[in-house]
Amino acid sequence: MKIHQLSLFLENRPGQMTEPCRVLAAAGISIRTLTLADTQRFGILRLIVSDWQQARTQLEEAGYVVNITEVVAVEVSDRPGGLATMLELFDDRHINIEYMYAFTFSRDDRAVFIFRFDQPDAAIERLRAAGINVLEDVEVYHRITV
């Protein structure tokens, strides 16, 4: 199952992350995880939020251009080698990881990785065949808030 990620382009200068975070807070939308990648002139803020549709609406009304990308959330054992074992599944199928980021919890031994694959359906099929838990939007939200 694919989940929805919001991407915003921000100028690469101090203070640019504050306003989109304020917009989301004012709408009662929680940021579940994020990553910020920079280039010389701009940054790409990627967000997984509690309500992606409402977040998109609120951010667009505030003047932001919001791109929605389908990504794959995968639950992996938070132990040495957990990620390496999973990544091996993609090598022989030539499935490319365009980018990824992750978060962990202090209360259990699981990590959640967010992936952007060049072949998401093939990646999901491979993960499920290996018995790896591919999460849905609601599961990502639930695992972070419980």
Language model regions located:
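A conserved regulatory-domain signal marking ACT and ACT-like small-molecule sensing domains
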Residues: 1-146
